[in-house]
């Protein structure tokens, strides 16, 4: 093997230059350019010094636990990944006695940066199953299941059986039934047909002892819609199946092989009446049914999942944008000046255009994720303490929940889509080395993209959000109050707002631009809805006719939300020494977003055709500003090499050394002849064809 010290030596202007050893110097040079305190930027990102201290402590604990080390996962088969995931879940849960709820969630999220499979295999229980118990069960029911071991995952493992083979996004169309039997005070759970088989259920194949099962409530022949029932799947001592339960493994997936996704069928499975979660919908022993004032009250666990996925979009995006930008800072290709080293790819304007807006988007995601988490915590706290008989308080809670339901749907959709795009664009930006399994992009993409379809298909979520935006606008026209996120619909001044010589670098102007475009799209869609319904279409038919407009409204409103959240956070908590650099990043994100959808701003009249060139010039300007500080922006994420888990993205920039070592560590030198040489390769290379005999005869 060639010594690294002998590779790639060239002489330029009488100086020795080595492309193998130069990258660490290049990245050190980038760090020397940084003009802001990275510590202050990190504290801004994570909400203050106290949070940063907690995150750093949790990261250190994760790194020091050998069970959680993922460095060998890229070559690990499915069966081993699943077994390893259980060991890692045990390691993570070992901290729960001392962890606060916030710390436990954050510990799992941080580990999920490099191990999405374990993150979700545990999260199905802690987030979805326990979220369903907490959100839809009474206090007495929650306490009961905690005593059974649910909170500590002791003798108990929960899964979340919502999706069916024949239904996913349309929860109201689920077919599994729960029939109340008054004589025995029980429900009988049944899978009426193959299409009603519970499908994709994480934890079902191997782990789960219980499930939160979504089923149609049937009482005295009447269908009361889908409710949640806790059903035992396995005996907690022997792990054997309970009577009437059939389940299996759905097998190989595109990614997340560590998760034991399975299918479940129920045949006359009896459960006590108390196993129906009855915080909102209730069934008495006499069969009397009381319904909640809002169906979404039952689906609180889903909202919590979506809010978490917004945060996960940031956690994963920060890893891959860091890898791509560090690599861009040390990778040299081609050159424009004779006698000089090749050019760093980060210095090519087009490469800046590819990556730096995605860096800005990653920061924006963090601001929106934190805002959504606060909104979710406030709403769920209210729902936990509210008296269902207090109509006024319940009415306010329902308004808050509707707003959270809509905003989390849009943010979940567009942040998970963006994260998938960031992973793939960063892979492409790393050229051939991005295709190596050891640099993480392939596994991460395969693991991540399920986020775009589970817990709400992104397109369906956008259409649902668009419908809600039109309904908010209709309600406002009838005198109903607007939620805070759509308050701009009441701003009549937006109709006349234009750039009109104002400064496009002014955040107030940029926010107004997005509000005007969002307002215009929603008002126009609402006008069309009114026109269609007056023309004879039912509301549902009119909404279907407006599907494209609904999607567009959701897209614009969500981007406005991201823009606003970014600037609001800067104004609220950025220290003076980092604020200008954050404004540069926020302006890049906002102007790039305008450039991407410039037609909207022309249509609404905020911009004139002559203004588009100015937008493009400003995007180029901010790319240059951000480029000079790029090492600081990425270092501020605070990710060690353990969390990067990609040799071309290591902190020291020694990409070729680490990459070459990783490949050889995972693929040690062996017999140069492959194990199939004698059985397959040699017979192929030395095969005798009939044509060979004919040629020999011809020669004779």
UniProtKB/Swiss-Prot annotation:
Belongs to the acyl-CoA oxidase family. It comes from Yarrowia lipolytica (strain CLIB 122 / E 150) (Yeast). It is found in: Peroxisome. The lineage of its organism: Eukaryota, Fungi, Dikarya, Ascomycota, Saccharomycotina. Pathway: Lipid metabolism; peroxisomal fatty acid beta-oxidation. One of its GO terms (cellular component) is peroxisome. This is Acyl-coenzyme A oxidase 3. Oxidizes aliphatic acyl-CoA substrates of different chain lengths such as hexanoyl-CoA, decanoyl-CoA and myristoyl-CoA as well as aromatic/heterocyclic ring-substituted chromogenic substrates, such as furylpropionyl-CoA. Of the above substrates, the efficiency of the enzyme, exhibits the following order: decanoyl-CoA > myristoyl-CoA > hexanoyl-CoA > furyl-propionyl-CoA. Optimum pH is 7.4. Heteropentamer composed of five different subunits. One of its GO terms (molecular function) is flavin adenine dinucleotide binding. Pfam families: ACOX (PF01756), ACOX_C_alpha1 (PF22924), Acyl-CoA_dh_M (PF02770), Acyl-CoA_ox_N (PF14749).
């Amino acid at each position: 093997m060639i010594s690294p010290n002998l590779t790639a030596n060239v002489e330029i202007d009488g100086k020795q230059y080595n492309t193998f050893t130069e990258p660490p110097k290049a990245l050190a040079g980038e760090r020397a350019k940084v003009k802001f305190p990275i510590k202050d930027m990190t504290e801004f990102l994570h909400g203050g010094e106290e949070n940063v201290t907690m995150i750093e402590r949790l990261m250190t604990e994760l790194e020091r636990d050998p069970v959680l080390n993922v460095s060998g996962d890229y070559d690990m088969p499915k069966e081993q990944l699943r077994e390893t995931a259980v060991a890692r879940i045990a390691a993570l849960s070992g901290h729960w006695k001392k962890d606060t709820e916030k710390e436990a969630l954050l510990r799992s999220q941080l580990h999920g940066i490099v191990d999405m499979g374990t993150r979700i295999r545990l999260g199905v229980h802690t987030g979805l199953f326990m979220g369903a118990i907490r959100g839809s069960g009474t206090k007495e029911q929650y306490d009961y299941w905690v005593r059974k071991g649910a909170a500590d995952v002791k003798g108990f493992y929960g899964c979340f059986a919502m999706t069916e083979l024949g239904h996913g996004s349309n929860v109201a169309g689920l077919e599994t039934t729960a029939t109340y039997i008054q004589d025995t005070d029980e429900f009988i759970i049944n899978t009426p047909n193959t299409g009603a088989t519970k499908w994709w259920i994480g934890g079902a194949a191997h782990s789960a002892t219980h499930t939160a099962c979504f089923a149609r409530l049937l009482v005295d022949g009447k269908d009361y819609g889908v409710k949640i029932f806790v059903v035992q799947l396995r005996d907690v001592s022997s792990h054997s199946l309970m009577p009437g339960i059939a389940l299996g493994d759905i097998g190989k997936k595109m990614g997340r092989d560590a998760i034991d996704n399975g299918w479940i069928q129920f045949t006359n499975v009896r459960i006590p009446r108390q196993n129906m979660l009855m915080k909102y919908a209730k069934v008495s022993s006499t069969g009397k049914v009381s319904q909640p004032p809002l169906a979404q009250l039952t689906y609180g666990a889903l909202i919590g999942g979506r809010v978490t996925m917004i945060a996960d979009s940031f956690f994963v995006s920060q890893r891959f944008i860091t890898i791509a930008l560090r690599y861009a800072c040390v990778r040299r290709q081609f050159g424009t000046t004779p006698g000089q080293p090749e050019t760093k790819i980060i210095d090519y304007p087009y490469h800046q255009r590819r990556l730096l807006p995605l860096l800005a988007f990653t920061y924006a995601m963090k601001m929106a994720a934190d805002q959504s988490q606060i909104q979710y915590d406030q709403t769920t706290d209210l729902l936990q303490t509210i008296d269902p008989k207090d109509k006024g308080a319940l009415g306010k809670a329902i308004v808050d929940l509707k707003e959270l339901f809509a905003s989390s749907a849009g943010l979940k959709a567009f942040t998970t889509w963006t994260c998938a795009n960031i992973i793939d664009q960063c892979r492409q930006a790393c050229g051939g080395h991005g295709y190596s399994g050891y640099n993480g992009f392939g596994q991460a993409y395969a693991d991540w993209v399920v986020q775009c379809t589970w817990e709400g298909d992104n397109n369906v979520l956008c259409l649902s959000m668009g419908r809600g935006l039109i309904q908010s606008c209709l309600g406002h026209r009838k005198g109903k109050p607007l939620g805070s996120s759509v308050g701009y619909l009441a701003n009549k001044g937006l109709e006349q707002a234009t750039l009109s010589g104002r400064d496009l670098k002014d955040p107030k102007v940029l926010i107004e631009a997005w509000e005007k475009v969002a307002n215009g799209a929603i008002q126009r869609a609402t006008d069309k809805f009114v026109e269609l319904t007056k023309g004879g279409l039912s509301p549902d038919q009119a909404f279907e006719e407006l599907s494209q407009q609904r999607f567009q409204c959701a897209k614009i409103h969500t981007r406005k939300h991201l823009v606003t959240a970014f600037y609001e956070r800067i104004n609220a908590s950025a220290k003076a020494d980092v604020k200008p650099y954050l404004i540069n990043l926020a302006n890049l994100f906002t102007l790039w977003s305008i450039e991407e959808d410039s037609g909207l701003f022309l249509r609404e009249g905020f911009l004139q055709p002559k203004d588009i060139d100015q937008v493009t010039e400003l995007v180029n300007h901010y790319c240059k500003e951000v480029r000079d500080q790029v090492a600081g922006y990425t270092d501020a994420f605070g990710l060690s090499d353990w969390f990067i888990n990609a040799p071309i993205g290591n902190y020291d920039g020694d990409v070729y050394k680490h990459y070459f070592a990783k490949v050889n560590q995972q693929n040690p030198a062996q017999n140069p002849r492959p194990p199939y040489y004698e059985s397959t390769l040699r017979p192929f290379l030395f095969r005798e064809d009939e044509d060979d005999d004919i040629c020999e005869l011809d020669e004779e």
